[in-house]
């Protein structure tokens, strides 16, 4: 089951509530915040494919606008990538269990967002 998570973030020394609703796997790793997702981090991480576990996340609101997919490594490190990039799609297809409809959308370059 999915649970709703509200995120409290610190930004430039000021605390404020961020109106971001995240979809978090109930039995998954630690909550992933919007700040954990950065452009090009998948390509800059240079992680070999066998270091990625089969967990993957797709979210609504902020992440979908960025078309971000977050992989969690065996060491617990979070790696973010864009499904629009061929390398990310190949890694996702090889190392995740993706429903057929979303797999077809990925191959067509449509990403995971509706």
Curated annotation (Swiss-Prot):
Keywords of the record: Signal
- GO annotation terms (biological process): immune response
Under Gene Ontology molecular function, one entry of this record is:
chemokine activity
Q: Which Gene3D superfamilies match?
A: 2.40.50.40
Q: Which InterPro entries match?
A: Chemokine_IL8-like_dom, Interleukin_8-like_sf
Q: Which domain of life is it from?
A: Viruses
Which positions carry the signal peptide feature in this UniProt record? 1-26
Single GO cellular component term: extracellular region
Q: What does this protein do?
A: Acts as a highly selective agonist for human lymphoactin receptor XCR1.
Q: What is the name listed in the Swiss-Prot or TrEMBL entry for this protein?
A: Protein vCCL3
Highest lineage ranks of the organism?
Viruses, Duplodnaviria, Heunggongvirae, Peploviricota, Herviviricetes
């Amino acid at each position: 089951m999915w649970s709703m998570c509200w995120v409290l973030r610190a930004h430039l020394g000021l605390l404020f509530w961020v109106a971001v609703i995240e979809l978090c796997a109930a039995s998954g790793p630690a909550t992933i915040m919007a700040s954990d997702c950065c452009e090009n981090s998948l390509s800059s991480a240079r992680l070999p494919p066998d270091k990625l576990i089969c967990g993957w996340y797709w979210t609504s609101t902020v992440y979908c606008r960025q078309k971000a997919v977050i992989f969690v490594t065996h060491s617990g490190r979070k790696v973010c990538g864009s499904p629009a990039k061929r390398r990310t799609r190949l890694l996702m297809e090889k190392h995740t269990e993706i429903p057929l409809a979303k797999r077809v959308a990925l191959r067509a370059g449509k990403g995971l967002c509706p």
